[in-house]
Amino acid sequence: MPNFKSKKIKEINLPYSKDDVEFLWLAKNDNVSLIYTKVQEESFFLQIKKAQNGFVIKGDKHTKPSKIGYLQKALKIFKEGFCEDIINEAFGLKNNALIEKTPFIVDNFDELLSRLQGKIYIEIGFGSGRHLLYQAKENPNVLILGVEIYNPALTQVAKLAKAQNVNNILLIQSDARLLLSVLKSKSVEKIFLHFPVPWDKKPHRRVIGKDFCKECARVLTQNGRFELRTDSFEYFNFTLEQFLTFPVPKFSLRKNENLEISSKYEDRWKKQEKNIYDLWVWNFNQECKNYELNEFNLSSVEFSKEDLKKIEQNFKNITIKKDDFFLHFESIYKQDENLLLKVAFGAFNKPEHCYLHLDKTIDFAFKEPFKIQENIKAINELKEILKVQFKI
């Protein structure tokens, strides 16, 4: 994560803008200050954290922009405008950094849904993008949707797609399990999962699980196919066991088969003479219904100035666990007379993190989370907890 350390920070008078970067407002607690930052069409927090002999300034990891160049540019402007005596820095805004809006990266779920049409393939964890771009070139009439949790991978593959004149891809930063849960039933032709982290010693951290397999079965078309490629026999066998729970699945199992395209990980494993396993699954024959997306309905909550004072005074780092969701109040920040809450919530295997802005009403400081049932339940619980636990 790009960052730098400064001995001194000047007085921060906001709003402040320069070179398409805007610093609009600041929220803080005893240890951390968050600056609401806009670069072109994206918003995120810069984080200022007290450290030994100075301050560390970096991007907040739960709101970081989809383009690393946006964060680098914001850090550069903040350093020049508000910092003195720079101790060290670990960022550099390169001339070829991806700053301009690219059509290949979608920033949120609503934008993604509006652009999904026709045949769709999904690649989970596309990494360097070799296989994703190969599929896009081989299938020009198919939309290749890549989902990845690491921002640098999105930027890198978007650059490659532009350079190679590949136009039938979409990239989104997300947990794959979240993405699948909001796609329409029977809308995807293929799902690729190539060389996932095997987590052989911590299988609970694998993306593969019963719920994930059910979601694959739901979103795949009647003849749609899930394809796993892995160097871990344990992962291969675990995945097979999960899909064997379906009534009449069909499988294709292969070992050490060379494909037309090879990832950098596959090249490495082959040099080490490791075995490579392929598992294809189809014919799920499962009746599925589209989920109805409810609203978070935050408009029903209103606060007085006295309410906000009580929330600030009584705030505790607490976690509430229910059968199918959780809610964790992580931190609270003061923003003038208003408050900012950082919370984690949702399904246990698909947690969300977000900031909630509290003034007379309550709203998400950034984009809304995915509207899956576990998230809806967690936000409803949050509204009740604000009244009961924090005594307003």
UniProtKB/Swiss-Prot annotation:
Entry binding sites for substrate: 201, 231
Reaction(s) catalysed by this chain's protein: guanosine(46) in tRNA + S-adenosyl-L-methionine = N(7)-methylguanosine(46) in tRNA + S-adenosyl-L-homocysteine
Gene Ontology molecular function: tRNA (guanine(46)-N7)-methyltransferase activity
GO cellular component: tRNA methyltransferase complex
PROSITE patterns linked: SAM_MT_TRMB
Assigned EC number: 2.1.1.33
Keywords: Methyltransferase, S-adenosyl-L-methionine, Transferase, tRNA processing
Record: residues binding S-adenosyl-L-methionine: 123, 148, 175
Gene3D superfamilies: Vaccinia Virus protein VP39
Pfam family, one: Methyltransf_4
Entry-linked SUPFAM superfamilies: S-adenosyl-L-methionine-dependent methyltransferases
Pathway listed: tRNA modification; N(7)-methylguanine-tRNA biosynthesis
Similarity remark: Belongs to the class I-like SAM-binding methyltransferase superfamily. TrmB family.
Job of this protein: Catalyzes the formation of N(7)-methylguanine at position 46 (m7G46) in tRNA.
Protein's name according to its UniProt entry: tRNA (guanine-N(7)-)-methyltransferase
Organism per entry: Campylobacter jejuni (strain RM1221)
